[in-house]
Amino acid sequence: MCFTYILELNLGNKALNVAIRMAPNQKYPFNTRSFFTEDGKRPLRGGVELWRGYFQSIRPSMGKMIVNLDISTGLMYKPGPLINLCLDFFGKPDPNFLSPKRGLPDRERLRLQRFISGLRIITSHGPSGRAQTRVIRKLSSAGASGQKFTMRENGEISVADYFRVHARKTLKFPDLLCVEVG
């Protein structure tokens, strides 16, 4: 009897915690128990920022339930174009730094890949042309002009040529790394 009562209280407490987190989690970035706002954000080097966050939970106390609210801090990627984030990571201003043809060492490409792997990005370059959220998997070892893939009907084509022919878009930096997304 007592064990069942404790389980029911625990389940009720979990439900209340989910309920108080629902609205902030729909409006702000969050992790398991905290949500974060841009208020008071602090830029750091390397393409990241510190954001103020709030941890909240409902706790049982003697004869009542209390809301616990604590301050937390989260590390966020700098918002904006992906190319800017990559340049900030290296502290470089010239986009051509990200070109394997122009000497980007493979170890630096792998460092950048570890930094952005798993990052969710919004792109409108898909077949539909609508904005889609994608997850970065890895970086190509060649630039868009050297990275090739096979199309069913047309054979092998470079990423840069694909965009030029099929999307009618000439890439501004065809020698930069490609991002492989899932």
Map each language-model feature to its residues.
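Argonaute/PIWI-family RNA-guided endonuclease scaffold
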Residues: 1-182
